[in-house]
């Protein structure tokens, strides 16, 4: 029996063939269409995978694909932290943002050891990143007085430490910004009918839109991560229904990937 060839000993961000896994974050406002968009992308190419936001964990519900996954300690203890945050933001914003970032890091790190390890041209699409966790959502809650000075300081310290431990594995090769007006996002919130989000006011979406524009369109938002200033960004107008221009959007993504 012939001895099988030795396989390349790969790092978490490298496929078993030695090809680096491209990591692309899909960013945008609440209900801009990120979940719909990543579902489109994962059907395009077998070398493309997506890591959806772990919303089920935030709502303390096991999603279908996690049917056999062991519950985390936080899930066993109960509590819909997403709903708690929306209902009483001054009390729960710090808890929610910390857990949202933790669960995101856990999901994204786990994905690096998935089926893409055998892919020829692997691309991993994250539904949001640890950077929007901090510089869009947590920052907005602090500026809206939903986090006090002590909580914000602790959150930033914790975020810096988590990134010092795991951030290199999650560094982005590109960002796709799904750009939609706050009014369109509010309409989509009503349509998708997620109970926790039904009380979101337009003003909240407008604040998040402004931050996304500053970070991803005008590139004036400052972060602690210098490399982000040079990360390529593809901006897609998604005010229209994806069904009307799905093929065009996919082609733009392919072209973007060829240059990153």
From Swiss-Prot:
Protein name per its UniProtKB record: Deoxycytidine kinase
Sequence intervals crossing the membrane: none
Gene name of the record: Dck
Xref: PANTHER family: DEOXYCYTIDINE KINASE, DEOXYNUCLEOSIDE KINASE
Annotated substrate binding sites: 53, 86, 97, 128, 133, 197
Residues annotated for ATP binding in this entry: 28-36, 188-192, 240-242
Subunit record text: Homodimer.
CDD domains, sorted: dNK (cd01673)
Pfam family of the protein (one): dNK
Catalytic reactions of this protein: 2'-deoxycytidine + a ribonucleoside 5'-triphosphate = dCMP + a ribonucleoside 5'-diphosphate + H(+); 2'-deoxyadenosine + ATP = dAMP + ADP + H(+); 2'-deoxyguanosine + ATP = dGMP + ADP + H(+)
Localization per Swiss-Prot or TrEMBL: Nucleus
């Amino acid at each position: 029996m012939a001895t099988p060839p030795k396989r390349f000993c790969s790092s978490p961000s490298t496929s078993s063939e030695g090809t680096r896994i491209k990591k692309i974050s899909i960013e945008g406002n609440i209900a801009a269409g990120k979940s719909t968009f990543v579902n489109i992308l994962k059907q395009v190419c077998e070398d493309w995978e997506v890591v959806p936001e772990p919303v089920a964990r935030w709502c303390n519900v096991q999603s279908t694909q996690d049917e056999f996954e062991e519950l985390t300690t936080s899930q066993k203890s109960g509590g819909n932290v997403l709903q708690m945050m929306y209902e009483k933001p001054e009390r729960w914003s710090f808890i929610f943002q910390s857990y949202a970032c933790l669960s995101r890091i856990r999901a994204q790190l786990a994905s690096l050891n998935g089926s893409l390890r055998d892919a020829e041209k692997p691309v991993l699409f994250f539904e949001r990143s640890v950077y929007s966790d901090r510089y869009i959502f947590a920052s907005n809650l602090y500026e809206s007085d939903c986090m006090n000075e002590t909580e914000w300081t602790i959150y930033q310290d914790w975020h810096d430490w988590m990134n010092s431990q795991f951030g290199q594995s999650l560094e982005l090769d590109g960002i796709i910004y799904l750009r939609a007006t706050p009014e369109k996002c509010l309409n989509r919130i009503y349509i998708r009918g997620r109970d926790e989000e039904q009380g979101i006011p337009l003003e909240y979406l407008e604040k998040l839109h402004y931050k996304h524009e500053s970070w991803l369109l005008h590139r004036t938002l400052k972060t602690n991560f210098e490399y982000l200033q040079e990360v390529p960004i593809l901006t897609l107008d998604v005010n229209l229904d994806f069904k009307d221009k799905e093929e065009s959007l996919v082609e733009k993504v392919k072209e973007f990937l060829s240059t990153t």
